Amino acid sequence: MEGLNISNQVFDLSPLDIIPSHLYITNAFFYENKTPGPRPFMQSSLLKESLYRALQNFPILLGHVRRHRRNAMQIVVDCDNLNLPLYEEQTHPQLHFRHLKDHQFHRDVWPKDANIIDPRASPNGELLQVHVHRLAEESGVVMVVRIAHCAVDAKGFVDFMQSWGWFARNHSHPEGDSWPRLLADRRVMYEYLPPDVQPAAPRSMWHPASWLLGLLSTLVVLFLGLYKRLLGDKTPPDEIESHLFSVPPHTLDRLRYTATCIDPSSRVSDHDIITALFTLAFAHTKHLLTCRTQTVTAIVPCDFRHRIGVPSNFTGSCAIGLYVSIPGSLLQTPLTAESVARAALLSRAVVDTADKVTIQTFIRRALRAIAFVGDKVNVLYATMVSQAFSNQSRLGFYEVDFGAGGPVMVAPMAYSNTVAVICPAPGPGGDGVGVRVFLTLRPEVMRMLLAKGFLDEFTDMIY
C-alpha cells in the first residue's frame, strides 16, 4: 500500500451510519477456476494492486473512526496515518473447490478460519479486512471480506466490491471516465432532505440548551450502558447460532395466493412473506420459552435512495426501519399458511406507507436519538424490536468479478442476534432457486425453533 496518493479528508457520519457503527458487514465469496492453466488463479499481485486502486477511488475505508463533538462520529482520513486494510492469504493444499461444490458449500467443509461469527467491529480496528483462502491445485478461491458498517451499508459494500473487481479486470487500462464513481460524502444524501432533517450546527458548550442536553445525554448513556450490561451483549459470538434457510418458489407462490384470497386488492412481495414467516416462527418460539403472548415487532429496512432521488452510487447508510407489528392473536393458532399470509398483509400495509414524509420523520427521530445517546442508540433500538431484517436480495453480489467470472456462491455471516438477512440466490437472476434467509438467534431460541419445526413446512435448511 506504499505510495497511496490520498489527501486529508473528513467524513461526517449520519445518524443512519452511527446506529450500526458497532458492526462489520461480512460476506464470503466462492470463486471457481473454470479454466485451469499454468497461470495462478486470481493472482495475489492482481488482487492487491486492484485493491490499491479501488481504495484510491474510495478513501473513506482508509480512515479512522473518531468521536466528534458530543455524540457525533466522523471517519478521519489522515494521509500521514492511514488506517490500512488487513489483507491475509492462506493456502489449503488438501481442500479442492470440487469438495465444496459436492457438499453444496456447507460451512462444515469451508476452509479453516473462513467461517467468522463475531459481528462486532473494534472502535480502533481496520475498516476493511480481507482474508483470501487459496484452494488445492488452483481450483478456486474463497474470499472473506469485512467492511465496517459505519462506512457503508450493504449496497455500499457491494458497490465497493464491484469497484475492486472493475479495477482488477481493467488493470492494464488507464483510469478514465469509465471507472466506478462512488459517493461517500454524506452531504450527498442531505441535499435531498429539507434543512430540519439535517444535523444542526454545533452550539457552544456554555449555551444553556447545550449544557442541559449534555447533562441529559450523560444520564441516558449511563442508563443504557447499565441496561446493556444487565441484559447482556446482543452480539457475543459464543451466544449466537446461525443457519441458512431456503424458501422454495412454490412455497412463496402458495403463500402469495393465500394472501390474495384474504385480500384480493393487495399484492404482497417475497419480502413481505419472509418478514411474516420468520417473525411468526420467532414469536411462536419465544411464546413457548416465556409463556407470554404479546404483540411482536419486526423492523424492516426500506432503502430510500430511489424514493427521494439520492444517487444510486451513494454508499452510506440510506435506509429507514419500518416497524411491522404483528398482534398476539396470530400466535393463538398454529403457524399456518393463513397466519403467515395475514402477517404478510400487515407487512405490505406498512411498507406501502414509506413515502417522503415517513422517511423524513424517521431521520428526525434518529437525529434526536443520536443527540442524546450517540452510538448507544443501537441498545435503544434493540429494545424496540423482536426480529430485524436486512433485505439484500436485489444487490449485485454475484456480479463481483475479478476477471474470472462472478462467484459461484456468496454467503453472509457474522450477524447479530435476531437478525434475518434476505440473501441473493445463486445462479443467473436466481430464477427457480427461491429466497435464501440467513437467520441468527440465541442458541436456546434457535434450538427450540428447530425442534418444534415451525419452519419445516415452508423452508429447507441449507446449513
Curated annotation (Swiss-Prot):
* Record's keyword annotation contains Transferase: yes
Q: Give UniProt keywords alphabetically.
A: Acyltransferase, Transferase
GO MF annotations, alphabetized? acyltransferase activity, transferring groups other than amino-acyl groups
Q: Which InterPro entries match?
A: CAT-like_dom_sf, Plant_Fungal_Acyltransferase
A Gene Ontology annotation in the biological process aspect, one of them, is: helvolic acid biosynthetic process
- Top-level lineage group: Eukaryota
One Pfam entry name = Transferase
Q: In which pathway does it act?
A: Mycotoxin biosynthesis
Give its E.C. classification number.
2.3.1.-
UniProt keyword Acyltransferase, yes or no: yes
What is the documented function of this protein?
Acyltransferase; part of the gene cluster that mediates the biosynthesis of helvolic acid, an antibacterial nortriterpenoid. Protostadienol synthase helA cyclizes (3S)-oxidosqualene to (17Z)-protosta-17(20),24-dien-3-beta-ol (protostadienol). The synthesis of protostadienol is followed by several steps of monooxygenation, dehydrogenation, and acyl transfer to yield the final helvolic acid.
Family note: Belongs to the plant acyltransferase family.
Q: What is this protein called?
A: Acyltransferase helD2
Q: Which gene encodes it?
A: helD2
